[in-house]
Regions:
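Distinct, well-ordered alpha-helical segments
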Residues: 114-122, 144-153, 212
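Active-site-proximal loop/turn and secondary-structure-junction residues that shape catalytic pockets
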Residues: 108-110, 140-142, 166-168, 204-208, ...
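Auxiliary Fe-S-binding modules of radical SAM enzymes
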Residues: 1-34, 38-40, 44-45, 226, ...
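Surface-exposed cleft-lining segments at the edges of enzyme active sites
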Residues: 135, 169-177, 204-212, 252-253
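Core AdoMet radical
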Residues: 70-88, 96-116, 127-143, 157-184, ...
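Acidic (Asp/Glu)-rich catalytic clusters
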Residues: 92-97, 124-129, 147-157, 188-195, ...
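N-terminal pre-triad scaffold of radical SAM enzymes
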Residues: 26-76, 93-105
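Conserved C-terminal portion of the radical SAM core fold
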Residues: 182-244, 263-286
Length: 327
């Protein structure tokens, strides 16, 4: 493993000031309109292929400055006006086909009062309670009775998505998330105790890991999450794009994972959950997948295979050996 070849302290913990100083500018946004929304198919916990409406809500920037995060580019510097979040939900629902589930992703923490005003919870609930599942994202340290109160009012299945990223303790500390693996575990126990489903985000090859170690720790991390009762695991190939990641790339501390690693981790993960946690779903994120191609001839076929595995939750036939040498 890359870190084992160096002084443990050589991988620096990022601090807010360094991360902020490296940033490019933000995008200009309207607080009354979500900055993006889409409907896509996802394998449900029942095993059906369902349509899911995902809203990327415009709101105040998250107070956590995670090293790898670029979601702040589509956030505001101030709290949204009361009524803005319900209006954003209306805007998206009116412009999309029907869906069974809804994700309210806000580039931060749903239960942060400065991001999503609690005064709007009632109006939000009125708009989403007809969905079978309502999925929000939240930091472990903000996961408490607020989520239970929201669930009680909601009257449908609530699911909270938490970014674990990795169980590697030094790498997690270097991501500036201000959390530990135990913080994550406690949050999962709390949510499951209150009949709130949990999904988690994991990074494939965060800064500080080489290709082999990136694969290994992604697999270890997904096993850890599944063993804690997480019902849905989303693997995110780590990307540049926020300033500090480019600096780490220049310093040799970070490089994108390969699409072959994306395939391998998804394969190994699906095999593990099939044997040990058959109700756990596992997805590999394919946003900007073209940037992970190292061969334009077999890259698209590998992306298509990953998408098929995302939808089927089964290991699909391998891509034939390519002229590039990868099989």
């Amino acid at each position: 493993m890359f870190l084992e070849k160096r002084d443990e302290m050589a991988w620096p913990k990022m601090i807010d000031q360094e991360i902020l100083a490296a940033r490019p500018g933000k995008n200009r946004l309207d607080p009354w309109i979500p900055y993006a929304f889409l409907v896509e198919s996802e394998r449900s916990r029942r095993g059906t292929l369902d349509e899911v409406l995902t809203l990327f809500l415009t709101n105040q920037e998250c107070s956590f400055r995670c090293t790898m995060c670029d979601l702040w580019r589509n956030t505001l510097d101030q709290r949204v006006p009361l009524g803005a979040i319900p209006a954003q939900i209306d805007f998206a629902i009116e412009r999309t086909p029907p869906a069974r589930h809804i994700k309210l992703y806000n580039a931060g923490n749903f239960f942060d009062a400065q991001a999503i005003p609690p005064e709007d919870h009632g109006q939000i609930i009125a708009r989403v309670r007809s969905f079978e599942t309502v999925i929000v994202e939240n930091h472990p340290r903000l996961t408490d009775e607020r989520s239970v109160r929201f669930r009680d009012q909601l009257g449908t299945q609530l699911e909270v998505a938490i970014g674990l990223e990795t169980i590697h303790p030094e790498i997690l500390a270097g991501l500036n998330k201000r959390m530990t693996v135990e913080d994550f575990d406690q949050s999962v126990r709390f949510l499951l105790k209150h009949q709130i489903d949990v999904r988690t985000f994991l990074l494939l090859k965060p800064p500080g890991l080489d290709e082999a170690s990136g694969r290994e720790w992604a697999l270890r991390s997904l096993k850890h999450a599944a063993e804690r009762g997480v019902g849905c695991i989303s693997l995110i190939p780590t990307r540049p794009g926020n300033g500090i990641m480019e600096q780490l790339q220049t310093q040799g501390e970070f490089s994108r994972p390969t699409i072959q690693s994306m395939e391998w981790v998804l394969e190994q993960g699906l095999e593990f959950v099939r044997k040990h946690h058959p109700t756990t779903r596992l997805f590999m994120d394919l946003w900007d997948v073209e940037s992970f191609y190292d061969c334009l001839q077999c890259g698209p076929a590998r992306a298509e295979r990953i998408q098929k595995m995302n939808l089927s939750q089964q290991i699909e036939p391998a891509v034939p050996t390519c002229v590039c040498g990868h099989s």
